[in-house]
Amino acid sequence: MILPGGFLLLVLLAAASTSQIVWAAEKSAKLATVRIGYVSRSILDMPYIIARDRGFFREEGLEPELIFMKAAQTIPAMLAGGIDFGSATGTGIAAAVSGVDVRLIFALTDRPSFDLIAVPSITSVQQLRGKKLGTSGVGSLAEILARQILIANKIPLEQVTFLPFGTSDVTYVALKAGTIDATMLQIPQKFFAVDEGFRNLASGADVYRAVMGGLTTTKNTINDRPELVSKTIRATMRAVRLVKNDKNYVLGFMKGPHLDLSGERARFAERVYDATMQLYLSSHTVDETLQREMIAIASQRVKPAQPVPPERVFDFSFVQKVTATLR
């Protein structure tokens, strides 16, 4: 039977459409889910969002799920299998030093962007005696930095009340509400605070070098799913490369909904970008000297029974392998 030309065309179009749907479904079914718990709406977690939006994860065969959570929640979530990776590096290092079987596998920066910001009436670190200081959580990088600043200024830690609030945007709200007297704020919140009249008392980078921003995961994930680790790192590194090489794209991204840049995104975007370029590492690893320094600082609080070697906390082997193949 000979079909009319118009009807035949409709049949062919329907068949082609069906084939495309089936092909797309099969492709989607082949993607492996990767769940990343990220802890800030800042430049430290920007690469994961860019990697998702630009399709870098999907090009690695991964379907990303980015889950916003508190720093203290990342380790329990990883151990329970709720997420594969966490971006709270300070929390991850403290957990590893305490004996939890996790590793830091990717470093975004090696200098903290946190500054100690206080209410306008406090003009020096010495005036924090008897005051309330908000941090993101017990053992977090923000808390470690705050403690190091107090120690450097010879203030006994017991003379300051530490209150865990969660992410920087939450502690910033608490600072503005007068619930706390000071807190550690990172980019971009520290820019907002200073512009609004709050005091910048000290820089975390002046007292402490540390990995800030990056990825942690469990030893089981490293052993059982090495391809997932490599692909996640490769997608992230591609996003970092894009950030460094395409300023116009990143400025547009910063003016979108993903970063916490208050209501004046256009005014802050370029300022934040310039600060980002000064912080992002090229190697995404840190040397053994810094690794041991970070372990020593974490050990002051965690107090492990035995000395902790760097390989018990850090594993940059995947970054090194990906770097060798990424062009």
Predicted regions and their residues:
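Bacterial N-terminal signal peptides
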Residues: 4-18
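Conserved C-terminal helix/tail region of periplasmic/extracytoplasmic solute-binding proteins
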Residues: 295-327
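Secondary-structure end/capping motifs
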Residues: 223-306
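Extracytoplasmic/secreted envelope proteins and their assembly/folding machinery
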Residues: 45, 75, 79, 143, ...
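Pocket-lining segment of extracytoplasmic ligand-binding domains
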Residues: 91, 169-260
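Short, glycine-/small- and polar/acidic-enriched structural segments
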Residues: 25-177, 181-187, 200-204, 209
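A bilobed periplasmic-binding-protein/Venus flytrap-type ligand-binding module shared by bacterial periplasmic
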Residues: 50-51, 114-123, 212-228, 279-282
